[in-house]
């Protein structure tokens, strides 16, 4: 983005706080149908980002997003490191020369979500992170179309993400470890 004064650190701290406040839930969900390492991988990625806080503070917004992606790729285990890393690298590339506005944020986030779809060869309805991210992205796009205030757009986005996450409970998994469980994956929310 052209406004280099945007700091990513408050977002990283907010994500860390959210992960930590839901740590037991994340661990429980992943142990039920996943590899059981999702929480550890998320925490490892966030800790690596915070170790790079001085460097991240010196970068403009688009470069910081790209650096976040590269850091997540190199520090998080499992598929999520590659997927989240790809998302942030793509968002960084998309953010270059964009003004700070809801339309830009929507475009940047949507590009990141699309990169996960491409890398993971997945889509909504397959009991993956995309069942949360695609509704969040769609909500943000709709808010942009209706020229909503940012705070309202983000609240709508959060609600769409929660509803998307909850929708995975009755889905049959087609990707990841959960796909090997067949019908036994039903009744569990994807972590």
What spans do the regions from the language model cover?
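N-terminal loops that bind phosphate or other acidic moieties
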Residues: 1-191
